[in-house]
Every structure is written in C-alpha cells, then in structure tokens.
Amino acid sequence: MYRLLSAVMARAATTGGCAWGCGRRAAHQRAGLPPLGPGWVGGLGLGLGLALGVKLAGGLRGASPAPPAAAPDPEALPQAEPLQAQEQPLAPWSPQTPAPPHTRHFARAIDSSRDLLHRIKDEVGAPGIVVGVSVDGKEVWSEGLGYADVENRVPCKPETVMRIASISKSLTMVAIAKLWEAGKLDLDIPVQHYVPEFPEKEYEGEKVSVTTRLLISHLSGIRHYEKDMKKVKEEKAYKALKMMKEMMESDQEKELKEKGGKSNEKNDFAKAKVEQDNETKGRNSKPCKKKNDFEQGELYLKEKFENSIESLRLFKNDPLFFKPGSQFLYSTFGYTLLAAIVERASGYKYLDYMQKIFHDLDMLTTVQEENEPVIYNRARFYVYNKKKRLVNTPYVDNSYKWAGGGFLSTVGDLLKFGNAMLYGYQVGLFKNANENLLPGYLKPETMLMIWTPVPNTEMSWDKEGKYAMAWGVVEKKQTYGSCRKQRHYASHTGGAVGASSVLLVLPEELDAEALNNKVPPRGIVVSIICNMQSVGLNSTALKIALEFDKDRSDIP
C-alpha cells in the first residue's frame, strides 16, 4: 500500500494531476464534473494513509495471529431457488431425466422396453429407432435410440420424422370411412362407378367385379409388386400346404393331450407317414426362389406422378391374379386405386383430403413424402449392401402410392392416430355411463367394422390374426385353463425402402367398474419407426404393450 500511495503521489507531481490518465479525466470533464486535480489525489492519499494506520494499530495490539475469517452466514446470503423436477434442463426421456408424474408408475416398463429395443437394434444393425407409448390416451414414454443421420451424427429423438410405409393404408381407411359415414361412398358397388378409367375385369373368361370393400381387405385380385402370376400362385400353394401341415400337427398334439399324453405305435407311424407325404409334396410344389418386395423394381420407382388417376397406368391393364373375393393377396396397388376413389367421392385431391384429416386428428407432422420440400427432423434411410456395409438407400419417388405407403410421420402423431381409433371403438360402451363424452372421429359401428377380421384373409406379421379393413386384428382367445391367453389387439406394420414401422393398439379388457368410472380411450398404444428396411417390429411392439399393461394394472 505504501508503494501504491507513493506511485500515485509521484504520478500526480510529474503529470500535473493526470495520475489516473488524461483519458479518464477528459471523460470526467465531458460528463460536466469538476476536473481531477492534485487536491483530489491528495485526498485519496490521506484516506489510504488513515486506513493503513488503523490496520497497523490493530495488528500491534496482540502477538497472537488473527483467527481465520468466519464462514459467511448462509441465512444472510441470498439463496437461489432450486429448479423443480420438470424444469431441469435435461433431454426429455433420457435415462437421467426426472420422469413427469404421470410416467413414474411405468419406470419398470420403460427400463425393460428400452433394453428390449437396444437388443433388437443391435441384432438387426439398425442405425436408429424411435418408440412412443401411450396409456389411456396419455403419452408416457417416447425416446430415440441411435442415429437419424449416421454421416452427420444426428441422434434420433421423439420428433424424428421417418417413413411409415404401409401404416399409410390405415390412414387412408379413415378417409374411406368418413366418406362412407357421410353417404358419399358405397363400399359394395364396382369401382368403375367412381373411377371409369379403371377397366372392367374378367377372370378365366368370366366377368367379375372389383369393389371398394374387396380392395380394402386385399381380396380384389389386383397384383402387388410381383408381376409374374405363376410365381405368386406357386408361392401361395406352398404357403397353403405348409399351413395345412402345421394344422395337422396341432390337431394331433391336441388329441394326444386329451388322451392324457399317451402315444402308441399306430399314432407315431401315422404321424411319420403324414410328415413324409407332406415333405414329398412340398419338394414337388415348392416354388423357385421368390423375390421379396425389396428386389422388385417398382418399389424403387423414380418417376413422379401428378395424381392417383395417372398412377393407375402402372397396373390397370394387368390381369387379375384370382377371382375377386376368393383369395387374399396383399396389394399396395389396390390402395392406389382406393386413393382415386377417395378423390372422386370427396371432390378433393387425395392429398388435400388427407391433410384435412390430419388437421382434425392433430397430426401436424404427418405429410406425404416428397424430396423437394424441407421437412424438419427428417431422418435418412439405410440398407446393408452385399458386402454387409451400411449404405444410403437410393432415391425413390412415392407419388404412385401415397395411399398405400407414401407418408412420413413421428411416433407422437401415430400415437394420436391410434388413440383416436381406440376412442371411437370404445366410446359407445361408455355412453350410458357418461353422457358428456364427445363423439369419436369415427362412429363406434364404423370402428367395429374396421376392426372385425375378414374371412379368407391373412395377417402376415402375426399368424394368430386376420386382416380386417386396413388393420390386422388378433382376437381374444384362450384354449386351456391356466394356459396361454391371447389378447385382442389391432396393428399394422410397414416396410419401405430403408424404413420399417409398426402401430399397435391393445384395448383394455373392460369390466363394469371401468365402464362406470373411467372414460375412453382405455388401453395401450405403441408406435415404433426405424430407418432400416426389413425389420420385423410387431412382436416387439406387442411385448412393450404388455409390459406397460402390467404396470398399468398396479396403479391404484
């Protein structure tokens, strides 16, 4: 301090009072204040000297060192209020994020489901996967694993937008159902009534009718991506033989169980004979190696079509593969024709009509996939090449199949859609107990029709079920007491170039108490999207739904 005081005094003496720099004094003068002169500096020196004297006097009073400074009183200091749990600046749904109150009941289910998804992701080598789960209409978990864009290391998150592929069929069904409810569409008259551009058809010389109802459930006979009728028929014959063999084995096991599990040489010989005969028939009827959808050229179309009517030229002149109504053949092209029917029945362009539906359902991130527009949070899509290396999928244009597989969405929007369908399905059951309930987007009788399995159909992603109207449906069943119980659920999967998806709805098994004290929707909805093609996700979604259903049953 002596040195500081001496320096100040010396500077004042040599510079004529400009000890603090002329710049500062000039600034002081510009503010209209008195100039800083030697008197001001002298006053400063006097003050510093007095302070130093007091300090020295205090130090000379005792020989013992001064005690350490006391810690500040925490009561005297201003305290910052702690952040509440929901205000913590952590990524939503990360393992470190404090769970919102309505999700804490499902901590076990979330941990278990996250582990399951990690295992599925690792098994198939998927770059990224996003999941969303709602319970009784409330979203309780959504999370992204891996990368939406591998090259730029962009992680998946709940807002990630991906191709939903054939879940688009379920969206199109809502448009058809709304037109049917309004009396603008008859499901059972020939499609030429609405779309005369589609030619009348014959099968084996007989004139046949293709209707909207048959198109919805894939019973029209219109082809899928495979153009070779012979290959398709061989494949169907082989599948039928395989299914018959499985049914025979199941019947034999059932008969054995009813007899107390006892077997005999006669039964064993008969079983061996059946297996041998079926194996011989299988060798004779087994088709040559069938290309899967991703080996079909039409899946990779790059041509842009202006509307659904123009898209019909891809298949409208092809022969039917079988008589309408007689067999099931999954067909995305059938939904291209349905889009044209929606246009003619509604008076709107198909995409405009669908955007109105998305707006009503609050599905604000669901759009048709186009390459030119900037779509925020859109993922990139991947496949493994012949060398088992991860590569980007080629450019495709989905304008020829908006209705059957051309939309983009998020897990959150798919949950909203699933809950809207579940609400409409259940609201009629609750009406007597609660007259204040709003109507569903679709009427209860409409949803019952949509979720009722149709005869002669197949549900390829779960052999226990049947195809209904743009949904696969598994019905409730239990064969033996204290044994496996099959839950009723509806779902649709999707497979596109570089993408896989599933939307699954598991309705609650309602009792009288629930009908009197609860409101719809009641049940679990699961949506999963993935930026890797050929990933089967239905069984994973069902396992996740059942995990959340377990935790849900424990809520008081």
UniProtKB/Swiss-Prot annotation:
N6-acetyllysine carried by residues: 304, 349
* GO cellular component: a single term: mitochondrion
Looking up Pfam families in the UniProt record yields: Beta-lactamase
Indicate the residues annotated as transit peptide.
1-117
Q: Does the keyword Acetylation apply?
A: yes
* EC primary class: hydrolase
**What Gene3D superfamilies does the database record attribute to this sequence?**
DD-peptidase/beta-lactamase superfamily
Tell me where it mainly resides.
Answer: mitochondrion
Q: Which GO terms describe its molecular function?
A: peptidase activity
Segments of skewed composition (Basic and acidic residues): 249-282
Query: What InterPro entries does the record tag this protein with?
Result: Beta-lactam-related, Beta-lactam/transpept-like, Mito_Ser_Protease_LACTB
Which positions does the record annotate as the modified residue N6-succinyllysine?
A: 290-291
What PANTHER family does this protein's entry cite? SERINE BETA-LACTAMASE-LIKE PROTEIN LACTB, MITOCHONDRIAL
The record's comment on protein family reads: Belongs to the peptidase S12 family.
The record describes the protein's role as:
Mitochondrial serine protease that acts as a regulator of mitochondrial lipid metabolism. Acts by decreasing protein levels of PISD, a mitochondrial enzyme that converts phosphatidylserine (PtdSer) to phosphatidylethanolamine (PtdEtn), thereby affecting mitochondrial lipid metabolism. It is unclear whether it acts directly by mediating proteolysis of PISD or by mediating proteolysis of another lipid metabolism protein.
Q: What is this protein called?
A: Serine beta-lactamase-like protein LACTB, mitochondrial
Q: Which organism is it from?
A: Bos taurus
- The gene it comes from is LACTB
